[in-house]
């Protein structure tokens, strides 16, 4: 109305947006009579009727409960695909970023860390911050000592190519990044003292600490190791197991620069 848009066109735009958002039956209701998800769709409708070239959404789901957040997230993603409008979506929830974004920009303290597709961020994180931020559960970040042939973690040497080690010639310790699903149970590998087992049917998550870790490591959640195991008979609390690692799935990070060098 303030833009001198004719009344008939205003009504048409409102009806089109309401139909798109599934709000036709709520046009005569006051905001206080709407649910949280419906109010969120009304806010989107206000933007749609302006025919924008770009949407900017700043934490749009932060006030919704978990179930409604998932439902609204899928609605926003479907709507964006239908409209084909470039959308800049700001969020602290990495699940929202990974599931909704075509490209994701990861920032820390206002500094851009990496811009890439969700899969590239997951598979090839640029540094320790991105590695620890993307993924749920997060990537395991394990400190180890540089030795001949790789990096020693506990009593096991994780194979690392010489050309990778040569990229950090002055460092005696490096950080290994390993996704929970990159582990499997075997006879040789990193020793794990199992503290908690989460059985999910076909899979199970093992939470524990490196075998031989001191008391401080056991109490420190940041030192915890998480492994996703495909087994209907997973190890139990208190057991010691060996986690086998495919060297091709190991990320190596410099502790001086925090950059990935593998």
What are these regions (language model features)?
Residues 137-139, 150-262:
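Non-catalytic connector elements of ABC transporters
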Residues 124-147:
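C-terminal boundary and immediately downstream tail of ABC-type ATPase nucleotide-binding domains
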Residues 17, 85, 132, 220-221, ...:
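N-terminal hydrophobic alpha-helix used for membrane targeting or insertion
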Residues 1-129:
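ABC ATPase nucleotide-binding domains
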Residues 3, 27-28, 69, 99, ...:
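Generic, ordered loop/turn and secondary-structure boundary motif
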């Amino acid at each position: 109305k303030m833009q001198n848009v004719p009344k008939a066109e205003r009504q048409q735009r409102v009806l089109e947006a309401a139909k798109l958002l599934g709000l036709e039956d709520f046009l005569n209701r006051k905001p206080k009579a709407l649910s949280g998800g419906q109010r969120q769709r009304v806010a989107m409708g206000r933007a749609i009727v302006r025919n924008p070239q770009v949407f900017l959404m700043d934490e749009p789901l932060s006030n919704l409960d978990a179930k409604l957040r998932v439902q609204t997230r899928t609605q926003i993603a479907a709507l964006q695909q239908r409209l084909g409008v470039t959308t800049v979506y700001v969020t602290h929830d990495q699940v929202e970023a990974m599931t909704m974004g075509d490209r994701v920009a990861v920032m820390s303290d206002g500094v851009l860390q990496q811009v890439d597709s969700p899969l590239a961020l997951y598979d090839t994180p640029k540094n320790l911050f991105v590695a620890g931020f993307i993924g749920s559960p997060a990537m395991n970040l394990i400190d180890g000592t540089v030795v001949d042939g790789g990096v020693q973690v506990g009593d096991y040497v994780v194979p690392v190519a010489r050309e990778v080690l040569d990229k950090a010639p002055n460092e005696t310790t490096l950080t290994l990044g390993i996704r929970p699903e990159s582990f499997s149970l075997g006879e040789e590998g990193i020793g794990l003292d199992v503290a908690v087992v989460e059985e999910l049917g076909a899979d199970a998550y093992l939470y524990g600490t490196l075998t031989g870790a001191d008391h401080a490591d056991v109490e420190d959640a940041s030192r915890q190791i998480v492994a996703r195991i495909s087994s209907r008979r997973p190890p139990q609390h208190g057991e010691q197991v060996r986690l086998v690692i495919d060297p091709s799935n190991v990320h190596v990070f410099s502790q001086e620069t925090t950059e990935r060098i593998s």
